[in-house]
Each structure stands twice: as structure tokens, then as C-alpha cells.
Amino acid sequence: MAIFLIIFVVFFGFCILSTPLFRWIDIVYNKKNLPPGTMGWPIFGETREFLNQGPNFMKNQRARYGNFFKSHILGCPTVVSMDAGLNVYILNNEAKGLIPGYPQSMLDILGKCNIAAVHGATHKYIRGALLSLINPTMIKDHILPKIDKFMRSHLSGWDNCNVIDIQQMTKEMAFFSSLDQIGGFATSSSIAQEFRAGFLNIALGTISLPINFPTTNYYRGLQGRKTIVKLLRKIIEDRRGSKKIQQDMLGLMMNEEAKNRYTLSDEELIDQIITIMYSGFETVSTTSMMAVKYLHDHPKALEEIRKEHFAIREKKSLEDPIDYNDFKAMRFTRAVIYETLRLATIVNGVLRKTTQDMELNGYMIPKGWRIYVYTRELNYDPLIYPDPYTFNPWRWLENNLDHQSSFLMFGGGTRLCPGKELGVAEISTFLHYFVTRYRWEEVGGNKLMKFPRVEALNGLWIKVSAY
């Protein structure tokens, strides 16, 4: 009885204390010309509802308040924009009172110098350094041959498998391919395995609350970063002691430094390498997995993509690699990739932070607030994509959708993803060898979670056989 009395007193006391706090929040956040919306609980805001309900939370708020509303998520007062025209304006006007506004956990784990965190002249400089590594000429002459060689070798290991978890396999494929491009590290090498252990913790920690306690994903992410930083510092130190220039991303980036074209500090260099690994891993692995699923579920699309890739193979001997001209000819494959990105919504949106009070859409957004350019709902807008919940790669061939202002799957403005073509090349090469090499059928584990990241909760198991 005493325990129930204590619980009642604590709960009643909390309600009494919370009431003035909620009233204070309403007064603070409604005294200015802010967009409509709710701010939720003190300190925590509406983060729990946002993470638990995901897209439904956004749909409900949109139904109540329209395409532009306020909230308090991931520790910050935030304005959410689902207006296509306004989203383009926000992404194209970063210099006018806006800077990147990604969560603190992401900044802490990927590094304060990563390209997504910096702005102004520093961003322009680092973007130039990255584009010198992954521009179309570099993809054609250096990167695509490495990707092709890796994919051939990596997928050959699947030949003796009967049933595989394609989610796990594409994660390994994306990670080790990225590591091969960055440092030329073989999949079976001990250093690759050390990178893998640290990196998996990084991937978990980036979308977590910044609570630095041993049982949290944020803590694990920080520990993973320490592991990766230590490994990279040792590699950079060893390479500086050698006169040989390695023909991988790290080597070429260090060579640019030697030629005084782009001089990055060790911290900047390390943060870019971690960011390249992270960006490529999440997008390439998940898009590859979901493309395999969608192609399985839509036989006509599978038939069409096979037709495209067998036409390429007919012009080659068995051991000939695909080249840049082959890659550019993969029109339907690119359409499959774009449609997969759209329908699965691998990327939900981008964040900006105001550096001054600014007016948007007739409302005043205070300095220090986040603006969440939420693109997910645009992916299912029937005015842009007729029959939006249907997997239809042909829509990308019939209409120039990737040039429309609503196409924000790779970001926009000065922050259009510099690795866009690299990612498409990697997924295209994987699909080339996968669809020409295997037949497959799903055998279980097809329960998908699509927020906050796309994931098959029990794996996505498929039975593979030679084509």
C-alpha cells in the first residue's frame, strides 16, 4: 500500500510541476510569429513520438498544421518543411542565414570537420578535395575498374551458398568495397576486420540521442570512432614515411596535399574518410538490398534489367570487365536505383540550422532553430509520381524526373551529394553481376522496418542458384 501511495504522490507531484512547464513552453514558443505546431514535453520535446511513430507522426502533424509546422525533435526546436518549392529554396540558399544542422550525435561520431558539418569557404574547399577523387574522370579511369574487380571477386564467394541473408551480404559488400577503394585493404585482412568492428558501432551511433553512457548506441559510436581514428592515424603515418603513392582514395588525397592543391589537416583527412565510408555504406547496402527485393517482387522489371545487362555481356568475353561506356548505357538500371531510393525512402530528409532570425513562408524562424527539409512525403505525392506506392522504374525513363525540383534524394544546392555517381556506379556494378549470375527466391524474413532507417528486422533471406 505504501508503495502505491509513493507512486501516486510522485505522479501527482510530476503533474503539478509539469503543468507550469507546459504553460511556459506554450508562452515561449507562441510569443513570436512561429509556424503552427506542438512542442511536446519539456527537454524531450516530441522525439519519442517522432522515433516511435516515424512517418505517421509527420503525416498526423501535416494533416493538423499543413506543410510547414514547428516541433521539438532530437533535442532541438525544429521547423519541418514538406513544401517542395520551399525545400528547394532552403537547399539553394545556405549562405543566407543557414548552415548544416545535423544532430549532435552525428557530428560527434563522424567528426566536426566532415563535409556535412562544415560550411562556407571550408565546405567549398573540402568539397573540391573530395570531387578531385570521385569526379567522372576518376570514376572512369580509376574507381570503376576497382569496383568491377571487387564485385567479381566478392560475389564469387556466394556461388557455394544456398540460402543467404541478402541484407547482411549487401552490408558486407558495401563496406568492404568502400574499404578497398579507400585504402586497398583486402576483405580477409586483419586491418579490414578491425575497421569493420569499429565501423558497425559508428553506423549505430549516428542516429541516437547523445547520451554518453556505456549501454547506449551513442557511447558505442564514440568508441567505434576512436578505433577507426587510431587505425587511420597509423596508416597515414606509415604512408608518409614511404615515398610510394598508393592508387586509392587515401593515397590520392595525400598526393593532392603533396602537390599543394588541397592541403587537409590529419583531422580533416580522417573525418572525410570516415564520412565516405559511412555515406557509401548506408546508401549502397540498403539500396542494393531493396533493389533485389523489388526486382524479385516485379518479374517484368527483373526481365527488363536482365535484358539490359545480358546485352552488355554479349559484347564481351567472360572475363572482360564492364567499363564506363557500359555504365552510362545502363539506363534501366539507373531507373531501378532511383525508383528504389524513392519507394523505400533510404533518405528521409536533410537538416539546416538558422544562424539568425529569418522569415520563411510568412513566419519568423528564430536563430538557432533547426529546419528539417522532410522529403519523404514528396516521394509519395501522386501529383509528382502517379500511383506512388507502385514500383515502376519506367516512370524515370518516360519523364525527366531526376531533373525536377522535387528530386531531392541526393540533396540539393551546393550540397548535392558529391558521391552520387560513385554510389550509382557501385550499385549498378553489383546488380550487373548479381542478375546475370543468379536466380533467387525469398525464403523468409521479409518483415521490413522503414524508419528511422530501412531494415529487415530478421534479415532478408533468399535462396540463390546459378542462372
UniProtKB/Swiss-Prot annotation:
One Pfam family it belongs to: p450
Compartments, as annotated in UniProt: Membrane
Cofactor(s) listed in the protein's UniProt record: heme
Name this polypeptide is given: Cytochrome P450 85A3
Gene that produces this protein: CYP85A3
Primary localisation category: membrane
Catalytic class of the enzyme: oxidoreductase
Catalytic activity: 6-deoxocastasterone + reduced [NADPH--hemoprotein reductase] + O2 = 6alpha-hydroxycastasterone + oxidized [NADPH--hemoprotein reductase] + H2O + H(+); 6alpha-hydroxycastasterone + reduced [NADPH--hemoprotein reductase] + O2 = castasterone + oxidized [NADPH--hemoprotein reductase] + 2 H2O + H(+); castasterone + reduced [NADPH--hemoprotein reductase] + O2 = brassinolide + oxidized [NADPH--hemoprotein reductase] + H2O + H(+); 6-deoxocastasterone + 2 reduced [NADPH--hemoprotein reductase] + 2 O2 = castasterone + 2 oxidized [NADPH--hemoprotein reductase] + 3 H2O + 2 H(+)
CDD domains: CYP90-like
Biological process per Gene Ontology, one example term: brassinosteroid homeostasis
Organism expressing this protein natively: Solanum lycopersicum (Tomato)
Pathway annotation from the record: Plant hormone biosynthesis; brassinosteroid biosynthesis
Task of the protein: Catalyzes the C6-oxidation step in brassinosteroids biosynthesis. Converts 6-deoxocastasterone (6-deoxoCS) to castasterone (CS), and castasterone (CS) to brassinolide (BL).
Similarity-based family: Belongs to the cytochrome P450 family.
